């Protein structure tokens, strides 16, 4: 599998998803620095996203990854996507994940519309990171991409 970076605002659910994809469904602690797993995937701090003074750190961190997974809470009506981020990652596969779909104030339809307007494409994944079946949809999708690319099939953004 290629290297993945998880990006999104503070509290979006990046670390919870990062952990869930590794089979860890315990409560996530706040990410204070860039963290890596055994495969080299990267969990980025939300501060990199929320504060323009940290954009350079975010851009530098994303240089060597193959895929961006953008995590946006279904209970967050605003886009905080740094200007130009999708352009920087134009050669990288970009996947949008709508997290926190189980929250009482979640508005999945509005979040999907916001992400489409921002420039993300389908498929998008609606997740409750504490529900293994919900997370499995993303796991299966990532595995299918890997299998296609290993078989030499072209996928969107494959090189």
From Swiss-Prot:
Q: Does the keyword Nucleotide-binding apply?
A: yes
Catalysed reactions, as listed in the record: acetate + ATP = acetyl phosphate + ADP
Task: Show the Pfam families listed in the entry.
Answer: PduV-EutP (PF10662)
One of the record's GO molecular function terms: acetate kinase activity
Provide the primary localization: other
One GO process term, biological-process aspect: ethanolamine catabolic process
Q: Which residues form a coiled coil?
A: none
**Disulfide connectivity?**
none
The UniProt entry's GO CC annotations, sorted and at most eight, read:
bacterial microcompartment
Family statement: Belongs to the EutP/PduV family.
Official protein name in the record:
Probable acetate kinase EutP
């Amino acid at each position: 599998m290629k290297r993945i970076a998880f990006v999104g605002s503070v509290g979006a659910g990046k670390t919870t998803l990062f952990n869930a994809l590794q089979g860890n469904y315990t409560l996530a602690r706040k990410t204070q620095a860039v963290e890596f797993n055994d495969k080299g995937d990267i969990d980025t701090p939300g501060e990199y996203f929320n504060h323009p003074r940290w954009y350079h750190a975010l851009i530098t961190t994303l240089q060597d990854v193959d895929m961006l997974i953008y995590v946006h809470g279904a209970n967050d009506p605003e886009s905080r996507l740094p200007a130009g981020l999708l352009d920087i990652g134009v050669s990288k596969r970009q996947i949008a994940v709508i997290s926190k779909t189980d929250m009482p104030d979640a508005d999945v339809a509005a979040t999907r519309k916001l992400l489409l307007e921002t420039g993300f494409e389908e498929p998008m994944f609606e997740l409750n990171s504490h529900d293994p079946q919900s997370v499995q949809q993303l796991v299966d999708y990532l595995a299918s991409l890997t299998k296609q690319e290993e078989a030499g099939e072209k996928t969107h953004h494959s090189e």
